[in-house]
Amino acid sequence: VTGQAIESASLAGFEQRARTFSIVPITIILFFAGTVAAALANVRRPDVHMRLMVVASVSLLTPAVARLVFLVLAGEGAPRPGMGAEPPPIAFSLLPSFLGNLVLVAAMVHDWRARGRPHRVYVIAGAALVAVQVLRVPLGATAAWHAVTMWLAK
């Protein structure tokens, strides 16, 4: 699907920005898969499994939150990114990512109140999630990432 989106955007004249922005959905998928795999490996440890599944779920919120943010900022009649309109700058992904992370913050606050501190899974996996969200901004514009997208689009 990402390869099709890149090709569609390139036909509309937005190839570079589409290639750069494609790091967002791909890192979301990879982080989700890795977190779910870790959760499945810890199924016999319910406290770890549950929290990894929460972090995995939070990692998927970015696209939904981005649609709401775009609707608020651009209005209802504006053309949607990825549907013939220019893809947004990659830095735009930070706002919906961090807004989605508020669900994780709420879970950490719940742990803090119930256990006296947040569970280490929330701290470690949450920090990894934020690192991925922040690092994809500079990495998306690199020649190495664009080479990956060329391979994906084939």
What is the role of each PLM region?
Residues 1-154:
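Alpha-helical membrane insertion/targeting regions
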